[in-house]
Amino acid sequence: MTTKAEIEIEQTATGSTLTSRQRTISLVAIYAAVFTWGISYAGLMPLMALTLEGNGYSTLSIGIIGAVTPIGVILVAPFVPFIVSRLGTLNTIFLSSVGSLVMVALLPIFNTYNEWLALRFVAGVFGGMSWIISESWLNSIASEKMRNRITAMYGAVMATSFAVGPFMLTMIGVGDFWPYMVFAILIAFSLIPFALIGKMAPVLNLANDMKISGILIAMPSLLAAALVCGMVDMSMFSFLPIWGLRMGYEQEISIQLLSVFVLGNVVLQLPIAWLAEKTNGRLVLVLCGIVGIFGPIGVTLMADNLYAMGAVLFVWGGCIWALYTVSLAMLGERFKGGSLTAACAAFVVAYEISNIVGPPAAGYAIELWEPHGLMALMSASALLFTVLISARGIYRT
């Protein structure tokens, strides 16, 4: 849910003359920082949703809370170049990370609904800064021959942290104070790796003059893939635990369902990428769309069999995330240079917009048809995508 593709990086002596050992140390440090931050983010979402649910808030209200963070990310993105030029790479990382952990630590203190809206919005602003700079840093030190593997590992680390977050919540429990402190401390831990590699921080030139006009007409199917992935991703983070509760599962099991869903994101990306390389990326998108249609149906029908339902969640989660990763690879095949930057910018904007729209839509769907509205909406969104890409033809984008 980030704007890494919007970033053009000017390699400097700091980024381009690193030794192999320095490059490896920097990459490991970035992965470690992203991992701890991701755990906090992924654990906080179901924690807040379950807390609001327990306090009697509607699913629509919970969905709105989930939507304000991406709004903060989108709004801060144009200002990141100015902030980095004034403060520098490392200082901006520290400012944004400290701001994020403070916002999380304040959640149990200022705990009215409107206060949470404000805190989550500001957290999105700070978190967006950290995310953009982290991925810029990663790109600036990645060699061309290793870039795909480096960014693939980054995605796997992120997905793994998203799986660990909800599981950690089941270990510490849903409470009024300590869970928030644990997740705030994890954000603080993410600063340690950056501090260790501070002297190797690159000077980043982040372009903010992107042109994305005409991209929608050129690649509607790929943008639709980003929209569906973002909608399902954020909606499941916000509501899958609540869906589990309303289907009769205990709270711990309901939270772990989310970990199973995200675990599919981690494990299945390389096999699906291999399939796309050996066959056709567009065909794989169609197949993933079909899984997206029938996955929610299967989860609902198998709700009485925890293991069977978990297997469907696992495969469904992997295929939904593959809509993003396979489409992103297809962008690289079709667009180059400045055109690629514009295409990826549109792609990321589509993903973030769906992050904003998805949770409120999912919450409203649950209110209309409790508890099956969530799965019905997820299936319907995948159906629309599959019809679109099929209508345009497997060999077109």
Feature-to-residue mapping (PLM):
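Helix-to-loop junctions at the C-terminal end of transmembrane segments
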Residues: 76-88, 173, 268-280, 366-367
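C-terminal membrane-cytosol helix-exit motif in multi-pass small-molecule transporters
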Residues: 170, 184-204, 388-392
